[in-house]
Amino acid sequence: MSKEVLSKSKEKMEKAEQALTRQLGTIRAGRANASLLDRLSVDYYGAATPVNQMASISVPEARMLLITPYDKTILGEIEKAILKSDLGLTPNNDGSVLRLSIPQLTEERRKELVKEVKKEAEEAKVAVRNIRREANEELKKLEKSGDITEDDLRSYGEDVQKLTDESIKNIDSITKDKEAEILEV
């Protein structure tokens, strides 16, 4: 039962790390990345449909995204959605595809993005700490019910802390890599 608590905690912590990686992938770092458009949806026959499900998104150059819709009639809607979004990008519509040029980031914008990255990382760390707290509470319940001894509680508590430390270290590494990518000129 207590090993189950550890494995569930490890799984949840890994999910928190993966969520951070996905979230940081949507932050524009001056390089073209198809995940920039992940949060973008277009009204398609009355349903909000993600752009990546209605178009092929490729990266032909380091600073350009090429959006080729499967249905050419939706091209204008995708263009409007990009213009309305907070991406700050202007699409170039040539009638069959959209080209998105990713401009160089200003120093000020880089600093804003680094702050955003740190905020996201802190939220991930809080999530990991909450998972640790839940695991410790679960272990204490097991000890109270007599399923594990006090020594086991201490030992498993140390294991939970090791998992937490490892996860926080991974989050710091992910964050550091993203910050370096943003600050790279």
Swiss-Prot record:
Pfam families: RRF
UniProt KW keywords: Cytoplasm, Protein biosynthesis
GO cellular component, one term: cytoplasm
GO biological process: translational termination
Subcellular localization, as worded in the UniProt entry: Cytoplasm
Domain of life where this protein originates: Bacteria
Molecular function in Gene Ontology: ribosomal large subunit binding
Family: Belongs to the RRF family.
HAMAP family: RRF
Matching PANTHER family: MITOCHONDRIAL RIBOSOME RECYCLING FACTOR PSEUDO 1 (PTHR20982:SF3), RIBOSOME RECYCLING FACTOR (PTHR20982)
Protein name (database record): Ribosome-recycling factor
Protein source organism: Listeria monocytogenes serotype 4a (strain HCC23)
